[in-house]
Amino acid sequence: MTKKVSRRLRELQAKVEDREYGPLDALSLLKETATAKFAEAAEAHIRLGIDPKYTDQQLRTTVALPKGTGQIVRVAVIARGEKVTEASNAGADVFGSEELIDEIQKGRMDFDKLIATPDVMPQVAKLGKMLGPRGLMPSPKGGTVTFDIASAIAEFKAGKLEFRADRTGIVHVMFGKASFSPEDLLVNLKALQETIDRNRPSGAKGRYWRTFYVSATMGPSIRVDINALRDYKLTEAA
């Protein structure tokens, strides 16, 4: 069955040419095509030359977006003793120990990011079936298993994101709000590009970046010239 495309989206698609755009032009066009009746996110969709079924071709890491995400991030912390107090003092929205694990098991999910100290991970592991599908399971690679609770809370509230390539090798990342200026979006997109390049899996072969698109949440896809983004100096974008 052919998916019906709305008139609004058809009109927006007509504004996008079938070519690669320079980074700033692409982001200006993203803003122009963000016409939904809610605050749309700016999204990147990147197909990489990797096959994640092989362990040396998997990508899972974090990026610190210099201009933030534009979202209020609710952080929960599971820890013990003085680390629970540290979490409270550092601005965690939800914090606790075994009692919080029990509450989550019963369905409590009023947070966007879950941080745990290494000593409680054996207990947190039993929440895997609930947290895993929601992308909330703490992991060392994601920076969410740590004893440095205060720093982790500050980073995630300031705009640190965890992302991974899906099983087809595609990365989907929200890198700000469509309401950001093109220049601020470019600063965040540059940070994302550098992070993906820096964390290239050892088993990746051939061309690493295959296709690279940006879009607003409800907007059309806009193809970006990855080489032009790589060549951009942050002083130009900032």
Curated annotation (Swiss-Prot):
UniProt-recorded Gene Ontology molecular function terms: rRNA binding; structural constituent of ribosome; tRNA binding
One BP term from GO: regulation of translation
Family matches, as Pfam families: Ribosomal_L1
Domain of life: Bacteria
Alphabetically ordered keywords of this record: Repressor, Ribonucleoprotein, Ribosomal protein, RNA-binding, rRNA-binding, Translation regulation, tRNA-binding
Cellular compartments per GO CC: large ribosomal subunit
InterPro entries per record: Ribosom_uL1_bac-type, Ribosomal_uL1, Ribosomal_uL1-like, Ribosomal_uL1/biogenesis, Ribosomal_uL1_3-a/b-sand, Ribosomal_uL1_CS
Keyword tRNA-binding: yes
Keyword Transport: no
Biological role: Binds directly to 23S rRNA. The L1 stalk is quite mobile in the ribosome, and is involved in E site tRNA release. Protein L1 is also a translational repressor protein, it controls the translation of the L11 operon by binding to its mRNA.
Subunit structure: Part of the 50S ribosomal subunit.
Family: Belongs to the universal ribosomal protein uL1 family.
Identification of the protein by name: Large ribosomal subunit protein uL1
Source species of the chain: Trichormus variabilis (strain ATCC 29413 / PCC 7937)
Taxonomic placement: Bacteria, Bacillati, Cyanobacteriota, Cyanophyceae, Nostocales
